């Protein structure tokens, strides 16, 4: 399977498929003519004497220096290699694959002026599994993601490092083993490759896809916690939510109702329950998780636009003029990443409060302390709850907005930057923490429901508990817990818990 990209109209679902599965991507051939036309225009300028930024001039603060036409190729080579200044660990390969696909989309719009040869090489690298090693740190998100994308371009030139066949190799060797040849860059091509927001956008999209998967799982575990605590489903009544009108809240309440439908536990306490209202972590799930869903959907629209954007500089416009601008500034991506952070924190915060409720006999309506079958002799899920609190707090500490932390760079020529790249990169560890929090809630909620026997939960939640028990058995007595938490985290991160319930129940990202 190969994803066929139509620059300008690429859909989030296709980008999600590239991220989750690693499937290759290539441009629809109908875009070749536009790419060639822009490349011809750049070649025409490079052969002339008029100075045009990025083609026959220096870069950044050095833009006023005219470069001789004989040195145009060397200019691009020097640009790429000098900008390979990334530090830190390598970005995950699935993020880099997505980044490369996004670069294809940008180049495919026919405004960058690169030869078709470069596009074909990126496509071939994706198809054959030559994935550049991209150090995770070094971009301030304007002028684009220079350092990370330079590491990609370097591999295309036979420099740098790449993953291929499970090995980390130098770029030239990786290309050779894949049956590919390095490219010699022509006018503007180095700049077109490294000047763009594709690294930040790939990281933000990865964070978005992961946060949405976690949000869906949190509806399952939240519904399960509701039944485990013998909470009321009355606050999920549809009219309550239509009276407020927020789509995410309405969709979340609908999902909770579907998950809890026909629960014998719920039926057992509809009448005669002395409790008037549940705590907010049970009762206000539609309001909190629904607001998070609305936020993620809003961010999804922003990132879908950015994924289809041309973000290098200068650009070949429709009248064949070449004009310098600032599309490389990743402020929209930085804002999007900062918003995703809010959803991650809040989904985790309310889930953690449900965990705390379930392990507290003063709040759990008859469940044993820490969900242990013999409390005292056994500590049960006591420290699992503490771990969830630690992860929740760690996420809060990472939630400071990155976009407000601009600093001048490059001799004050690039005097306002977005910080989008590390703002988006933190979404990966934050969502990993969130997967673990929701995994812990899954263990607690499943244990709580089982302790209500002989009463059973709903058919949908019964299927979800079966998925949990497929990887973690019931807690009969204290045991080594780290493996249980790891397995539960993987269950959430892989999407397996979401797949256990009927299709169509969990709200989609795209509406």
Swiss-Prot record:
Disulfide bond positions: none
PTM per Swiss-Prot/TrEMBL: Contains an active site 4-methylidene-imidazol-5-one (MIO), which is formed autocatalytically by cyclization and dehydration of residues Ala-Ser-Gly.
Cross-link 5-imidazolinone (Ala-Gly): where in chain: 142-144
2,3-didehydroalanine (Ser): modified positions: 143
GO terms, molecular function: histidine ammonia-lyase activity
Biological process annotations from GO: L-histidine catabolic process to glutamate and formamide; L-histidine catabolic process to glutamate and formate
Compartment list: Cytoplasm
Membrane-spanning ranges: none
GO cellular component terms, semicolon-separated: cytoplasm
Keyword annotations: Cytoplasm, Histidine metabolism, Lyase
Name under which the protein is recorded: Histidine ammonia-lyase
Naturally occurring in which organism (per UniProt): Chelativorans sp. (strain BNC1)
């Amino acid at each position: 399977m190969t994803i066929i990209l139509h620059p300008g109209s690429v859909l989030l679902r296709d980008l999600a498929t590239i991220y989750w599965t690693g499937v290759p991507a290539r441009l629809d051939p109908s875009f070749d003519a536009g790419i060639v036309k822009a490349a011809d225009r750049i070649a025409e300028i490079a052969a002339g004497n008029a100075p045009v930024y990025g083609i026959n001039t220096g870069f950044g603060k050095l833009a006023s220096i005219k470069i001789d036409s004989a040195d145009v190729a060397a200019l691009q080579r020097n640009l790429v290699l000098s900008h390979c200044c990334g530090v830190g660990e390598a970005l995950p390969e699935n993020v880099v694959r997505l980044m490369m696909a996004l670069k294809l989309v940008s180049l495919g719009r026919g405004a960058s002026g690169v030869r078709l040869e470069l596009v074909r090489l990126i496509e071939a690298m994706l198809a054959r599994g030559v994935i550049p090693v991209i150090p995770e740190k070094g971009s301030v998100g304007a002028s684009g993601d220079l350092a990370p994308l330079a590491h990609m371009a370097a591999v295309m030139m036979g420099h740098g490092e790449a993953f291929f066949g499970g090995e980390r190799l130098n770029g030239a060797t990786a290309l050779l083993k894949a049956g590919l040849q390095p490219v010699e860059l022509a006018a503007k091509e180095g700049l077109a490759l490294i000047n763009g927001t594709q690294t930040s956008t790939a990281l933000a999209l990865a964070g978005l896809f992961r946060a949405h998967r976690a949000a869906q799982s949190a509806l399952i575990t939240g519904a399960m916690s509701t039944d485990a605590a013998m909470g009321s489903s009355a606050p999920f009544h549809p009219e309550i939510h239509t009276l407020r009108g927020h789509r995410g809240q309405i969709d979340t309440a609908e999902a909770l109702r579907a998950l809890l439908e026909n629960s014998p536990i719920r039926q057992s306490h509809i009448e005669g329950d002395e409790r008037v209202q549940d705590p907010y972590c049970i009762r206000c799930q539609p309001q909190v998780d629904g607001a998070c869903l609305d936020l993620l959907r809003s961010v999804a629209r922003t990132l879908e636009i950015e994924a289809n954007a041309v973000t290098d500089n200068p650009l070949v416009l429709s009248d064949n003029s070449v004009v310098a601008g600032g599309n490389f500034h990743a402020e929209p991506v930085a804002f999007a990443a900062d918003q995703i952070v809010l959803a991650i924190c809040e989904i985790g915060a309310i889930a953690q409060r449900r965990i705390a409720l379930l392990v507290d006999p003063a709040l759990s309506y008859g469940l044993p302390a820490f969900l242990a079958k013999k409390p005292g002799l056994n500590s049960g899920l006591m420290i699992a709850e503490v771990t969830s609190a630690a992860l929740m707090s760690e996420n809060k500490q990472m939630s400071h907005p990155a976009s407000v932390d601009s600093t001048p760079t490059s001799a004050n020529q690039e005097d306002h930057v977005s910080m989008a790249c590390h703002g988006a990169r933190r979404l990966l560890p934050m969502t990993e923490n969130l997967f673990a929090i929701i995994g812990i809630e899954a263990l607690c909620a499943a244990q709580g429901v089982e302790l209500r026997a002989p009463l059973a939960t709903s058919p949908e939640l019964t299927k979800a508990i079966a998925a949990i028990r497929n990887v973690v058995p019931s807690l009969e007595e204290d045991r080594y817990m780290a493996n249980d938490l790891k397995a539960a985290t993987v269950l959430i991160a892989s999407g397996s818990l979401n797949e256990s319930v009927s299709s169509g129940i969990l709200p989609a990202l795209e509406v």
